[in-house]
């Protein structure tokens, strides 16, 4: 039986109070490899990983490993009020010009065959099954 975690409202709002973390949440419209987040945001991988760990700790992001790649996706908060706030935050981010630019960069990055071929990175939102 899995132990249910206590919802920490302060940590939830602290997670949303950082521009880099908001940018990360904005890019998660399905599962995405950390390599794409690094490429789109133009930040060092350790910084991105630190912010993703904070989002995981706040219950906003879930992760899974596939080979050497970490894949992240949004996780709905257990608290109904927090879930509603997150949904509204994501809708608001969609209207922000800088966030729209991030999404456009993601589309270019993930759809560039040379980048995928060179890095061997999986396409965001698509699960690759190993044989």
Question: Where do the language-model regions lie?
Answer:
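Generic N-terminal leader/processing signal
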Residues: 1, 45, 63-66
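C-terminal regulatory/oligomerization modules of transcriptional regulators
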Residues: 1-5, 32, 36, 77-131
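A cross-family signal for key residues in well-ordered alpha-helices
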Residues: 14, 23-26, 56, 62, ...
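Alpha-helical residues within the helix-turn-helix
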Residues: 39, 50, 56-57
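Short amphipathic alpha-helical/adjacent loop interface patches that line ligand
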Residues: 41, 52, 103
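Beta-hairpin "wing" of winged helix-turn-helix
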Residues: 57-66, 73-75
């Amino acid at each position: 039986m899995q132990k249910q975690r206590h919802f920490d409202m302060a940590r939830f709002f602290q997670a949303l109070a950082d521009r880099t973390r908001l940018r990360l949440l904005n890019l998660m419209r399905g599962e995405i490899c950390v390599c794409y987040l690094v490429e789109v945001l133009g930040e060092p991988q350790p910084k991105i990983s630190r912010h993703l760990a904070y989002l995981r700790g706040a219950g906003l992001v879930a992760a899974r490993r596939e080979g050497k790649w970490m894949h992240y996706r949004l996780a709905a908060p257990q608290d109904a009020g927090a879930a509603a706030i997150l949904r509204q935050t994501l809708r608001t981010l969609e209207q922000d010009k800088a966030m729209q630019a991030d999404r456009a960069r993601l589309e270019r990055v993930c759809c560039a065959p040379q980048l995928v071929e060179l890095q061997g990175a999986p396409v965001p939102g698509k699960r690759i099954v190993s044989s």
